[in-house]
A protein has these predicted regions:
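Active-site proximal beta-strand in glycosyltransferases
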Residues: 45-47, 54, 58-78, 126
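Nucleotide-sugar donor phosphate/pyrophosphate-binding loop at the beta->alpha transition
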Residues: 26-33, 66-69, 77-94, 133, ...
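Conserved donor-binding/catalytic core segment of Leloir-type glycosyltransferases
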Residues: 143-172
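Carbohydrate-associated surface elements
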Residues: 108, 130
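Membrane-proximal helix-turn-helix segments that form the acceptor-binding/catalytic region
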Residues: 35-40, 62, 85-102
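A conserved catalytic-core segment of Leloir-type glycosyltransferases
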Residues: 1-41
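A short beta-strand/loop micro-motif in the catalytic core of glycosyltransferases
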Residues: 46-47, 97-107
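A structural signal for the hydrophobic beta-strands that form the central parallel beta-sheet
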Residues: 104, 126, 151-154
């Protein structure tokens, strides 16, 4: 019975999208919908892609009994630089506790999951983000050589945990030791 839920004139739940003021309510509503879908559809595995979807994945697992595999791009330890939000941590940990498989984007993230969230290393695997190798045509393009200079390029996301401020901080540390580096 979902009579307590707010629905529109068509009897549908409306989602705000983005990061609304009622984010946790949105996460809960999404979880309810996942449970309904899990009861009605046939599937083999549940994949929850980052902490916002972990409650939905857990709910679908409880309803269906199917295995839950979660994807961890970053933890709140990474995003907050150690100033962890207890609510977010709780959601992340609950998702990890219920997961049958935890896919982490790096070995560093895997170690964070194991040690900060107390997860069994046997169910945690590092699955690195990757790119396709350059085609031979691109590899054959002549490059300007700077034999005495090393080049470091920022390719991160413009967010706190991967943002340019880390690049600038790292550049300052490197330049304290050597000057033959170009940052771009």
């Amino acid at each position: 019975d979902f009579s307590y839920m707010h629905v529109n004139d068509l009897g549908c739940m409306e989602f705000a999208g983005g990061y609304p003021k009622n984010l946790h309510e949105e996460i809960n509503n999404y979880s309810i919908i996942a449970g309904v879908v899990a009861r009605q559809q046939e599937f083999d595995i549940i994949h929850a892609h980052d902490w916002l979807t972990y409650p939905a994945g857990v709910h679908a697992k409880m309803v269906s009994g199917k295995p839950l595999c979660i994807h961890v791009h970053a933890t709140d330890f990474d995003r907050s630089r150690g100033k962890v939000n207890p609510t977010v941590y709780s959601i992340e940990k609950d998702g990890m506790d219920h997961a049958d498989c935890i896919m982490c984007v790096s070995e560093l993230t895997r170690q964070t999951v194991i040690h900060q969230y107390h997860q069994d290393p046997r169910k945690c695997v590092a699955m690195h983000n990757a790119v396709y190798p350059l085609s031979q045509e691109l590899q054959d393009i002549p490059r300007v050589e700077h034999p005495k200079e090393k080049v470091v390029t920022f390719l991160g996301r413009i967010t706190m945990q991967k943002g340019p401020e880390y690049f600038v901080e790292a550049a300052a540390l490197v330049l304290q030791r050597t000057r033959n580096i170009r940052f771009c």
